């Protein structure tokens, strides 16, 4: 048995050079220029076809979509509720009346949120008649004014701190927008405290949402739309250094807007906790 001869470094280097380019056959990396050309042509045609197929599929799908109204809306049984300002942790508001920095961010968020509701920002909107849905048929859709004065003590006009410095904080509650929704009745957002150490005031009175703000026609069609708001002001009983209360709000006053569902306990309702320290 003879041992396999070990190639020298120069022999291995020469073979690699020959593999990279063979001057006698004109091959580069083992293929002729014609072979490389055919392979590149194949992949160019193959991936070009895939790109064209993907583009056509996307185009065909987009033709079925309406740019102004969602195609599928039957799975939204009833709107939910949202609160503002955004809580620091999981629907809990905690602050100290004697420490402005603890509620400074909440006040700033409320100011920013209510800025589009100022008189100046709404001067080009329509003063709509109360008590009835504002039905429109386009192509131009007008948006109704929502006077911030309806929020009374929570408007930021009479109290720049929205009640936080006095231990009577304001929380804004709004109903999620659903295109073309018209409430069957007179919608309102009803809020009650779970504990007996506080009372709740709502603005507008009884948390009423005027029908003139319905229906909503979508972001692109209904430019300038102002969503109706309900302000909830928590008023604690005096005499306690630490005051806590959980507030539950739900949609009421209509037959088609639900607030109970075994599968979705948050449908048409929201609850939040307020903790105020001296």
UniProtKB/Swiss-Prot annotation:
Q: Relate the assembly described in the record.
A: The sodium/potassium-transporting ATPase is composed of a catalytic alpha subunit, an auxiliary non-catalytic beta subunit and an additional regulatory subunit. Interacts with catalytic alpha subunit ATP12A.
User: Which tissues is this protein detected in according to the database?
Assistant: Widely expressed.
* Region entry immunoglobulin-like, spans: 186-278
Source taxon at top rank: Eukaryota
Protein name, please? Sodium/potassium-transporting ATPase subunit beta-3
Disulfide cross-links: 128-144, 154-170, 191-249
**Function summary:** This is the non-catalytic component of the active enzyme, which catalyzes the hydrolysis of ATP coupled with the exchange of Na(+) and K(+) ions across the plasma membrane. The exact function of the beta-3 subunit is not known.
Sorted keywords for this record are: Cell membrane, Disulfide bond, Glycoprotein, Ion transport, Membrane, Potassium, Potassium transport, Signal-anchor, Sodium, Sodium transport, Sodium/potassium transport, Transmembrane, Transmembrane helix, Transport
Species = Mus musculus
Supply the gene name.
Answer: Atp1b3
Q: Output the Gene Ontology terms for molecular function.
A: ATPase activator activity; ATPase binding; protein-macromolecule adaptor activity; transporter activator activity
List where the protein spans the membrane.
36-56
Query: Mind listing the GO biological process terms from this record?
Result: intracellular potassium ion homeostasis; intracellular sodium ion homeostasis; membrane repolarization; positive regulation of potassium ion import across plasma membrane; positive regulation of sodium ion export across plasma membrane; potassium ion import across plasma membrane; protein localization to plasma membrane; protein stabilization
Those parts of the protein on the Extracellular side are 57-278
Topological domain (Cytoplasmic) residues are 1-35
Membrane topology (UniProt): Single-pass type II membrane protein
């Amino acid at each position: 048995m003879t041992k396999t001869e070990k190639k020298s470094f120069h022999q291995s280097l020469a073979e690699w050079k020959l593999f990279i380019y063979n001057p006698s056959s004109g091959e580069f990396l083992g293929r002729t220029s014609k072979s490389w050309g055919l392979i590149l042509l194949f992949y160019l045609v193959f991936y070009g076809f895939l790109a064209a197929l993907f583009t056509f599929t996307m185009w065909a799908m987009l033709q079925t979509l309406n740019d102004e109204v969602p195609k599928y809306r039957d799975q939204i049984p009833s709107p939910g509720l949202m609160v503002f300002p955004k809580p620091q942790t999981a629907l809990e508001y905690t602050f100290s009346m004697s420490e402005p920095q603890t509620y400074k961010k909440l006040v700033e968020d409320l100011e920013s949120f209510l800025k589009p509701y100022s008189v100046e920002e709404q001067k080009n909107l329509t003063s709509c008649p109360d008590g009835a849905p504002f039905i429109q048929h386009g192509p131009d859709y007008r948006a109704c004014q929502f006077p911030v004065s309806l929020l009374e003590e929570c408007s930021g006009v009479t109290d720049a701190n929205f009640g936080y410095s006095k231990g009577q904080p304001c929380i804004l509650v709004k109903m999620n927008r659903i295109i073309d929704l018209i409430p069957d009745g007179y919608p309102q957002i009803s809020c009650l405290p779970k504990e007996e150490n506080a009372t709740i005031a709502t603005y507008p009175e009884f948390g009423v949402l005027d029908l003139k703000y319905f229906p909503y026609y979508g972001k692109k069609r209904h430019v300038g739309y102002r969503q109706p708001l309900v302000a909830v002001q928590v008023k604690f009983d005096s005499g306690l250094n630490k005051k806590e209360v959980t507030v539950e709000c739900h949609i009421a006053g209509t037959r088609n807007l639900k607030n109970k569902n075994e599968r979705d306990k948050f449908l048409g309702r929201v609850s939040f906790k307020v903790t105020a320290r001296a």
